[in-house]
């Protein structure tokens, strides 16, 4: 007799990570349920989704969101809760409120604090002797206005999908930002100032079992899309990067998914780490390369001790067609560019030659044609609205600074 599949609840359904996790889980024979503040979220349109539960946005109302999730877990007899975005941080803060029998893989809140904030991450990397660009944390206008080479990057303490990141190329841009930061009291939480370096952006994704690395994947951004995201990805293999990720996860005794961005310095080849995402990130390139991050996370969540997965195949080129359309529309706001991009994606020509679709896999999950059609129609009607799609999605799943303060209050009152 085949054992029953666990009942899985994903923490949101609007992000690209959620959409891809749904595909990977579905192809493995699972059916999932979603929590979403958006009734027509991207994840809804899948043959692998059984139900979408309405809940407040975790960023706008973390208390209401948590209450809704706990009610869903109880009434739907959920076995596993998979945090596919920043809700992992929320659940870590609310750990004592989660049912004892619920399967969920979470590191301690103290470990999250070391990677959730960009300033804390920089301190962690320095302590572990992990390469990073020349970095400093500034907490005053005077420090920010000090002399330093241009260009450089400024990063807010918290941000997702490349929000809260500014590239400063000269004194005029620096002074404009300085005025804004003083007005918004941004120096109170510390701002990360980081030197710009030349090189390819690569991302590494991992799953840990109480500090033991069990799955790791790396890919290179071949083509950048809206908000600094990816349109094209190329899988790569790097033993030194895997060793660095393993060292960080071991030091934090990490449990669950953990991802990093780094720049491979063009001059030295050194991987300089620049950002962390304490969660599962877009797992389809890994899956198509032979690394099952989502499956590993599910096993760990169920309390199993999975074997260590080998590196995947290098050279697997994947595309996010939906992001390619938004990218084409945002550049010059022209319908002809959108139509040309549709043709290139459909025929796998131009920059899409040799790629496999990872975000909207029409052949395996035909339901995704509905949101894809909506986006295409809207972009052909008004190409200048491309940015709104990403902004709406990010607002549905990201944590605001106010929400983060609320989560910390939960911790302090526990």
Q: Whereabouts are the PLM-identified features?
A:
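Peripheral (often C-terminal) accessory segments that flank ATP-dependent C-N-forming ligase machineries
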Residues: 144, 299-414
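Active-site "cap" helix and flanking loop/linker of ATP-utilizing ligase/carboxylase catalytic domains
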Residues: 237-262, 278-332
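Active-site nucleotide/adenylate-binding loops and adjacent lid/helix of ATP-dependent enzymes
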Residues: 112-192, 198-199, 210-212, 238-243, ...
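Glycine-rich phosphate/pyrophosphate-binding beta-alpha loops
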Residues: 162, 222-227, 232-233, 277-291
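ATP-binding N-terminal substructure of ATP-dependent carboxylate-amine bond-forming enzymes
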Residues: 1-107, 368-387, 392, 398-414
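Phosphate-binding site of ATP-dependent enzymes
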Residues: 174-248, 264-273
């Amino acid at each position: 007799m085949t054992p029953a599949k666990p009942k899985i609840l994903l923490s949101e359904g609007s992000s690209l990570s959620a959409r891809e996790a749904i595909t990977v889980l579905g192809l493995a024979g699972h059916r999932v349920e979603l929590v979403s503040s958006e009734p027509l979220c991207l994840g809804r349109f899948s043959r692998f989704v059984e139900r979408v539960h309405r809940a407040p946005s975790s960023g706008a109302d973390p208390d209401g969101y948590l209450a809704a999730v706990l009610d869903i877990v109880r009434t739907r007899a959920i076995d596993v809760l998979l945090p596919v975005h920043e809700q992992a941080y929320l659940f870590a803060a609310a750990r004592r409120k989660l049912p004892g029998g619920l399967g969920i893989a979470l590191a301690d809140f103290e470990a999250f604090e070391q990677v959730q904030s960009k300033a804390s991450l920089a301190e962690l990397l320095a302590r572990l002797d992990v390469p990073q660009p020349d970095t400093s944390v500034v907490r005053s206008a005077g420090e920010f206005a000090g002399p330093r080479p241009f260009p450089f990057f400024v990063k807010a303490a918290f941000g997702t999908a490349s929000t809260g990141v500014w590239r400063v190329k000269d004194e005029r841009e620096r002074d404009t930002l300085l005025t804004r930061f003083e007005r918004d009291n941004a120096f109170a939480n510390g701002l990360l100032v980081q030197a710009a370096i030349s090189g390819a952006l690569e991302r590494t994704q991992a799953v840990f079992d109480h500090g033991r690395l069990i799955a790791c994947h790396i890919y290179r951004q071949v083509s950048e899309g809206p908000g600094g995201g990816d349109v094209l990805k190329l899988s790569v293999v790097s033993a030194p990067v895997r060793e660095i990720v393993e060292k960080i996860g071991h030091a934090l005794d990490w449990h669950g998914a953990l991802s990093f961005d780094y720049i491979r310095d063009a001059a030295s080849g050194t991987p300089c780490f620049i950002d962390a995402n304490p969660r599962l990130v877009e797992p389809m390139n890994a899956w198509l390369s032979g690394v099952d991050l989502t499956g590993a996370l599910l096993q760990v969540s169920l309390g199993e001790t999975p074997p260590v997965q080998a590196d995947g195949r290098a050279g697997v080129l994947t595309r996010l067609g939906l992001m390619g359309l938004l990218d084409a529309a945002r550049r010059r706001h022209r319908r002809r560019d959108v139509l040309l991009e549709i043709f290139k994606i459909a025929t796998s020509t131009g920059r899409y030659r040799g790629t496999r679709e990872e975000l909207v896999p029409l052949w395996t999950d035909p339901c995704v044609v509905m949101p894809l059609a909506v986006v295409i129609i809207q972009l052909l009607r008004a190409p200048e609205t491309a940015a709104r799609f990403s902004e709406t999605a990010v607002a549905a799943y990201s944590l605001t600074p106010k929400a983060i303060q609320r989560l910390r209050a939960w911790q302090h009152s526990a």
